[in-house]
């Protein structure tokens, strides 16, 4: 039996993630009280049914160690993944404004504004986020995009083995929150300053030809591949579900996209489970 515990910020997409898991055949329970988690899991352990439960801020005990302790104990007995849904404040404010729903922490006697409730929830959930096996940032994603992201990550994990995620990004949009390793490639020659190349992306052949003229680009590509190859056996031995490698340049359009695609394909050709994402390209395509 596999257990996925879904948690994260209110408005970040926990309900969407749970619906995706239900479509994938998981038996899903929404907002299960933490003190019932251990008993519930053991009551259905013999069914061999994969299970997903969501836990939100209303059900998290004041002493968070009660939850993290339960999760750590379950991990010694079962295949447990803690999925944490994250999003930036701007996205959460926009979603609450669109749905006109009240934040859970604004209910009751606390009388917190939406902004205060989001900040307070972030503070409470930080230790749980540190225990997460998989963090998905839904900032700027549509319902369909988030559903596909959850589906890809879960289906990749169900095939067993480490899933390698390579994502390009632009530093001007901020660091990705789910990265295990971040490589800054802003020091490499920039095709942006070539007028004929500026409209293209790192997926286009002229950009590849430009970058491959420079030994610094080829050397960095080789060194990143070698670094990952060196430590990959130990990462796999550590029973990790995912390894997320983020490569960033200024705008996330040329250098980072080229290197992310090339390095991702390198490991895919070696038989690894690989997912490649170009976050800034996807962001700009929607605008």
Curated annotation (Swiss-Prot):
Which residues participate in GTP binding? 56-59
Supply the alphabetized keyword list: ATP-binding, GTP-binding, Nucleotide-binding
Q: Which residues bind ATP?
A: 8-15
The terms under GO molecular function for this entry are: ATP binding; GTP binding
The UniProt similarity line reads: Belongs to the RapZ-like family.
- What NCBIfam families does the record tag this protein with? PRK05416.1 (NF003828)
Functionally, this protein is described as follows: Displays ATPase and GTPase activities.
Name the record gives this protein: Nucleotide-binding protein VP2673
């Amino acid at each position: 039996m596999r257990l996925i515990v879904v948690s994260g910020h209110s408005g970040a997409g926990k309900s969407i993630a749970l619906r995706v898991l239900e479509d994938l055949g998981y038996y899903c329970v929404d907002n299960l009280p933490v003190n019932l988690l251990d008993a519930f899991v053991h009551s259905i352990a013999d069914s061999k049914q994969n299970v997903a439960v969501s836990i939100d801020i209303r059900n998290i005990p004041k002493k968070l160690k009660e939850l993290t302790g339960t999760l750590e104990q379950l991990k010694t007995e079962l295949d447990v993944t803690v999925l944490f849904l994250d999003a930036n404040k701007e996205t959460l404010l926009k979603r609450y404004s669109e749905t006109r729903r009240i934040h859970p922490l604004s209910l009751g006697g606390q009388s917190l504004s939406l902004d205060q409730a989001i900040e307070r929830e972030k503070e409470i959930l930080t230790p749980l986020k540190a225990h997460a096996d998989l963090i998905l940032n839904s900032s700027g994603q549509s319902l369909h995009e988030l559903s596909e992201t959850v589906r890809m990550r879960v289906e990749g994990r169900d095939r067993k083995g480490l899933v390698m995620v390579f994502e390009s990004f632009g530093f001007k949009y901020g660091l990705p929150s789910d990265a295990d390793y971040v490589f800054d490639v802003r020091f490499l020659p920039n095709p942006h300053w070539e007028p004929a190349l500026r409209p293209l992306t790192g997926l286009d052949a002229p950009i590849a030809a430009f970058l491959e003229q420079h030994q610094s680009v080829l050397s960095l590509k080789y060194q990143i591949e070698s670094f990952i190859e060196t430590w990959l056996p130990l990462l796999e031995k550590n029973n990790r579900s995912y390894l997320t490698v983020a490569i960033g340049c200024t705008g996330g359009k040329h250098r980072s996209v080229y290197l992310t695609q090339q390095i991702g394909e390198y490991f895919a050709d070696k038989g690894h489970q690989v997912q490649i994402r170009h976050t800034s390209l996807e962001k700009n395509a929607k605008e």
